[in-house]
Amino acid sequence: MSIVGFISSYQLDIMLFLSGICAIMTVMTAMTKSLAPSRRRVLALLELAAVLLLMFDRFAYLYRGDASVTGYWVVRISNFMVYYLTLYLLHEVTLYLIDLYSGKGIQQNFLRRLRFCELLFVAGTVLLVVSQFTGLYYSFDENNLYHRAPGNFICFLIPLAISFLQISVVVQYRKYLSRPVVISLMLNAVVPIIASIIQLFVYGVSLTNISIVGMVIILHLNALVDLNEEVEHARQTEITVYKEARKKEHDLFKQTVGALVNAIEAKDTYTNGHSHRVAMYSERIARRAGKSDEFC
């Protein structure tokens, strides 16, 4: 059995499984305090959109061919939401990129491309709404079965353009991000593109949607890896600063004690330098006794 055949046979179960994983990740992300509020919000919405995408896609398949009133509305609402959520996920990835590059000290030229991604998102949403009344993207027959329209390729071109713009930003400014994040962002853009190309020639299999959600899961995992690296770096920096502060405090204490001893000994010619000689002899005795440098 081919991969496409396997997905076609078990895609409803795969959708349910992946949506459950994304639902758990949504709750975990919302509860995570280590992430910045803006990044936590973007990731949580991204994962929630992935859950809804698979659930609506699943409903579209379950009620396909159901000519009842319920089937009529479920199929139409589900297909509309599948198309919209595909665009919305790319919109959230754009916001995620903006958040990642904010505060990196780079020029704002990349924002022009990401803003254009947002314009494409709005344009795609408007065309999707228009298609509901004109049949630009798809239509339904009397048996409530979905059929692609000649203009269906447009709904593939817009996400494709957004993905290429996102890839160009990631490639150009990859040195500002960690390796796991760069890899996950590239996969998040490239894998759905490949799936979309296959989807053009294969009907009845949600390769694109399943691949998108799979990449969202990978994006989440790599975001956690990046977060752990940032926390570890911050911890090491804090330890270094603490050690330097302790060393400065110790040096200051030695200088203060030395100044006090010198001031006291300066009052009497006999005791002048006495404390220094005692300390020197004590160090020699300790070294001959085999004590460590730290002890001495």
Predicted regions, residues:
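Short aromatic-rich membrane-water interface segments that cap or initiate transmembrane helices
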Residues: G5-S9, W73-L85, N144-F156
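Acidic/His-rich, divalent-metal-binding segments that scaffold phosphate/diphosphate chemistry
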Residues: T237-C296
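Alpha-helical transmembrane segments in multipass membrane proteins, preferentially the mid-helix core
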Residues: A23-T29, E92-Y96, F156-Y176
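Interfacial "cap-and-anchor" motif at the non-cytosolic start of specific transmembrane alpha-helices
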Residues: V169-V241
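Hydrophobic alpha-helical transmembrane segments of multi-pass membrane proteins
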Residues: D13-Y96, C117-F133, L185-L200
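Membrane-proximal helix-loop-helix units in multi-pass membrane proteins
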Residues: E92-L95, L100-L160
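Membrane-interface helix-boundary motifs at transmembrane edges
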Residues: T29-A44, D99-L114, V170-V181
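Hydrophobic transmembrane alpha-helical segments in integral membrane proteins
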Residues: M1-I24, N152
